[in-house]
């Protein structure tokens, strides 16, 4: 069965209100990558982030809750010590709120950060997702640099071309942000289009799962 892995970045509240109910209805799994951004950003925008209660509900519903750092910093520009602190802070936040220790990670902003790999391995992560528009080939791709397609805007052909690359052994990983996105309009996706995309996956008999589901299969 062809596999598509759904990932959602930045803990946007619309993922809880709009995305998760539809995924539950369709029987789809997904990974939600959580960050908190910096204090100044949160002071203005915290209402657009999921709360601990909402994260716990997603976890109870069987979705994967994963680490996207605390401040959403571009890791290539920081030392291992700073990276480790970012990862520890987010792990602690999740576990203090009743979420299991994360096993998946996503690089903020998308680019692979080689300087983060040793830190991720020390903290027992199974995989780390970057963003580059190609399918994941387990035989050749490093699990600490998973490729993924960023799905946003209004381009159904891009979505269809992305999922067409999936097969039983080589899943396609998709990255979404807000549906809709309230603060970062360049990664916005309309709910009607998201619903259309999920219908394509359902009608196409794709296996739709989280990163954790794939790596712990």
Predicted regions and their residues:
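Boundary/entry segment of secreted carbohydrate-active catalytic domains
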Residues: 2-14
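Metal-dependent polysaccharide deacetylase catalytic core of the NodB/CE4 family, i.e.
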Residues: 3, 24-126, 134-146, 169-181
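Glycan-processing catalytic domains of CAZymes
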Residues: 7, 67, 127-129, 133, ...
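Aromatic/hydrophobic pocket-lining residues that form the small-molecule binding cavity
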Residues: 15-16, 51, 83, 87, ...
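Histidine-anchored nucleotide/phosphate-binding helix
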Residues: 16-23
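Catalytic grooves of carbohydrate-active enzymes
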Residues: 151-213
């Amino acid at each position: 069965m062809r596999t598509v892995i759904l990932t959602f970045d930045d803990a946007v509240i619309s993922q809880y209100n709009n995305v998760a109910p539809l995924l539950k209805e369709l029987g789809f799994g997904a990974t939600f990558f959580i960050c908190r951004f910096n204090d100044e950003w949160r002071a203005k925008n915290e209402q657009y982030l999921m709360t601990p209660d909402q994260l716990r509900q997603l976890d109870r519903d069987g979705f994967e809750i994963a680490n996207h750092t605390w401040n959403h910093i571009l890791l290539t520009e920081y030392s291992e010590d700073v990276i480790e602190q970012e990862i520890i802070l987010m792990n602690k936040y999740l576990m203090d709120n009743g979420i299991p220790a994360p096993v998946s990670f996503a690089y903020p902003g998308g680019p692979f950060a080689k300087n983060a790999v040793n830190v991720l391995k020390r903290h027992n992560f199974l995989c780390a997702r970057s963003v580059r528009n190609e399918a994941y080939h387990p035989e050749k791709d490093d699990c600490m640099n998973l490729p993924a397609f960023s799905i946003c805007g209004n381009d159904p052909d891009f979505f269809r071309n992305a999922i067409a690359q999936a097969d039983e052994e080589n899943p396609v990983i998709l990255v979404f942000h807000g549906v809709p996105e309230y603060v970062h309009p360049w990664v916005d996706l309309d709910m009607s289009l998201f619903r259309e995309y999920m219908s394509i996956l359902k009608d196409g008999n794709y296996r739709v799962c989280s990163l954790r589901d794939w790596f712990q299969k």
